[in-house]
UniProtKB/Swiss-Prot annotation:
GO terms for molecular function: L-seryl-tRNA(Sec) selenium transferase activity. Its cofactor is pyridoxal 5'-phosphate. This is L-seryl-tRNA(Sec) selenium transferase. GO terms for cellular component: cytoplasm. The modification N6-(pyridoxal phosphate)lysine is found at residue 291.
Amino acid sequence: MSSVRLPSVDRLLRSAAAAPLHQRYGREALLATLRDLLDELREPARRGALAEIELSEAVLAGRAGERLAAQHASRVRRVFNLTGTVLHTNLGRALLPDEAIEAITLAARYPLNLEFDLASGKRGDRDDLTAGLIRELTGAEAVTVVNNNAAAVLLALNSLGARKEGIISRGELIEIGGAFRIPDIMARAGVRLHEVGTTNRTHARDYEAAIGPRSGLLMRVHTSNYSVQGFTASVPTAQLAAIAHGHGLPLLEDLGSGTLVDLTRWGLPKEPTVQEALADGADIVTFSGDKLLGGPQAGLILGNRELIGRIKKNPLKRALRVDKLTLAALEAVLGLYRDPDRLAERLTTLRLLSRPAAEIRAQAERLAPALGEALGEGWEVAVVDALGMIGSGAQPVARLASAALCLRPRQPRRLRGRALRNLEEALRGLPLPVIGRLDDDALWLDLRQLDDEPAFLAQLPRLRSELS
């Protein structure tokens, strides 16, 4: 095949085929893409490895359009979380209710009284936007909000215990995802770790014996992401608070996930509430906004007015403060807690966590035939009982009764791994990626969080073509 001549960049820019790209992406982006494309084709064209049709204006504009679309596609993608883990850290944790989404939109679109007191006309405090509501719901004397619970713990420790000892049970030296370890956080906060007791048993006398002139605070951490069972002992908050206060020390309790309601009301496992921790005498309580609370990422610090005042004066507070969008969403979510009787229908996270297994199974029965048709005869599609998880370190042992579509290749066992990987990749490559979980030589799609059936079904023809 003889060599063919490449069209000039200028000719392609002025072509009718490139006009829509020029309008959509702008001249500079289109120019750079065309130059890169022609540079790649120059050598193959010289060798005669390309046909003239491959260098036509229409074909080249089409290839440039594909590249530009990929370059300009958002890295933030909506996905279907069918893993069975509701508060999946890697998939964004809590889903916000409509009220919070509307509040975020309003705060993003218009100026607002972020740090402006409308009554006095003077500078205000951004914490005031949510503090009154949080005090009303929890009974806390004072409140401040930072950007996540790790920041809340760091700030509270640094404000109350810097250059002093923090006394904590050895069984509560937790690690959560992202290398967050209590000993490391205490060190960063300038607090000297003084661990007491053993991994499985800590007694009141252990704390009493550890308190001395260098003591700055007692700390209690809710071990929400693991469970120690069997021969165990721990000191409840009320008793630990009495010990701390008897020596003039504050008690800091980190609840981790944190909740404002008794989850057993909706058939979920018991989690300690913020109100219980405060009523039992904890001086400062910290917890997350985007886990069981069902709100945006935030770290809430509640408790004693004088101690919260010290925390708010810490220079780190400004570095860790939240923005207007977070506060707008948080206020909207907290407002839903004023009506606990309707909370499960309005708070997205609680609605998903408490969704009945029978309802999920009925959904799976509806979807199974269509998915079986899309996958073809090489796959078995079965509706099975499943056990999901809350996620984000909340109740790691507890399971949520659910139902799933179990996709198993009809192939010899030695070939199933490749088939499953191909299917998993095809599902992730859909316009709305579908994320499931591999288990027992099958791909499981737990439907607890499948809210949008039409969008899921609309992708099945695309899935079939990808697999064929």
